């Protein structure tokens, strides 16, 4: 007969009870009431946060945007074809994040940070919130360093500084993207990380931009975030924030960054589409009431950080497309009021062969000469005034038949100044050469050269300076000033070029 020992049995039971762990998994689950047009109405998610990520049964991710009393309006970040009415939705408890790191340089990714260039996965251990708070007042420093675009008209009259927000605005096909791409190409060797965000563009356009940057050797320090025209409105809406998050990683690590949002008109349209489908009340031009906040919270993330935070910077160049040159429409006026200046590209100038087609009259940089080296300040001071007076005289001279000699001289000078500011695409000019070109034009050295030969003369002068007067560029590069030695070298180069110029 088996001898039963009650004390042993009770100790075994006690041990089992001690080891028992009742793990309760609590998840916030809701039900899809309605689905269509990239929007889902979900019932039962009472504890969900604004902007929280939700997971549907088919693994599609959505963002909770509308929190109403009886349902939640969710925008889908994908096709969502497998989602049915009555299917379940789970709250993840997470806010949208994107992986960040140096591995993103030279890559093309979508709005969620997933590579779409066929070069394999990107390994990053760090992530950043897609929407993070902009640096505060104490964290910032005033803009004091230039970011050279390589475009003479911009660097001389509408200078851009590191940490500035400068709007590029104009009608379609006026060269807005070209200005942005030229600026990226000109950062070669400057230790500036560039992020190009393409919103609502054709895939072919993005592919040609990638090819251009690759040919010019600029893709190595650039990341491209693309939300193409056929992507859901949600991805077009979050793509600029993803680009800002990738750039912020480098900014907080003490590096200078440049972000181009091309373009924010399409982002606003995508946001309008989402808002109307979510039944938010429409305002002016059918945009929702918070469309200003859409752009301000994005552009306020651009900053020049204080030395305590590493002195990094994020320069933002948002692009806005106008309709028939109307800069007083809703989105253009909003973004003009948020940014620190604008570069206005005119269709009329573009068609007249003046490229880049910058309208100097209404283009402005609110940072001004703080974003220029001393050498540029010394020579470019008169340029904007001379061009403004020339534009006025040119309009007046169409009606007046006989003009005095002084007016004729001023018109001739103005035509030559306008000529030296013309520049072919993807051909940035170094700041030393820009100083030389402007000095030559402002001081009348081109007055005796025919207008149609000015550009050839300038090309010859640049070649002459590079080959026979390399000390000139060294002086400006090292001292950042246009001193008497540099001036004498330049005058000598101008004289030599004139002698050999036929």
UniProtKB/Swiss-Prot annotation:
Record GO terms (molecular function): ADP binding; ATP binding; proton-transporting ATP synthase activity, rotational mechanism
UniProt keyword list: ATP synthesis, ATP-binding, CF(1), Chloroplast, Hydrogen ion transport, Ion transport, Membrane, Nucleotide-binding, Plastid, Thylakoid, Translocase, Transport
EC class (word): translocase
Domain of life (superkingdom): Eukaryota
Subcellular compartments: Plastid, Chloroplast thylakoid membrane
Membrane topology: Peripheral membrane protein
Pfam family, one: ATP-synt_ab_C
Annotated site residue numbers, Required for activity: 363
CDD domains recorded: ATP-synt_F1_alpha_C, ATP-synt_F1_alpha_N, F1-ATPase_alpha_CD
Positions contributing to ATP binding: 170-177
Cellular component annotations (GO), alphabetically ordered: chloroplast thylakoid membrane; proton-transporting ATP synthase complex
E.C. no: 7.1.2.2
NCBIfam families associated with the record: atpA (TIGR00962), PRK13343.1 (NF009884)
Family as reported in the entry's similarity comment: Belongs to the ATPase alpha/beta chains family.
Subunit structure: F-type ATPases have 2 components, CF(1) - the catalytic core - and CF(0) - the membrane proton channel. CF(1) has five subunits: alpha(3), beta(3), gamma(1), delta(1), epsilon(1). CF(0) has four main subunits: a, b, b' and c.
Record's function text: Produces ATP from ADP in the presence of a proton gradient across the membrane. The alpha chain is a regulatory subunit.
The protein, known as: ATP synthase subunit alpha, chloroplastic
Organism whose genome encodes this protein: Guillardia theta
Lineage: Eukaryota, Cryptophyceae, Pyrenomonadales, Geminigeraceae, Guillardia
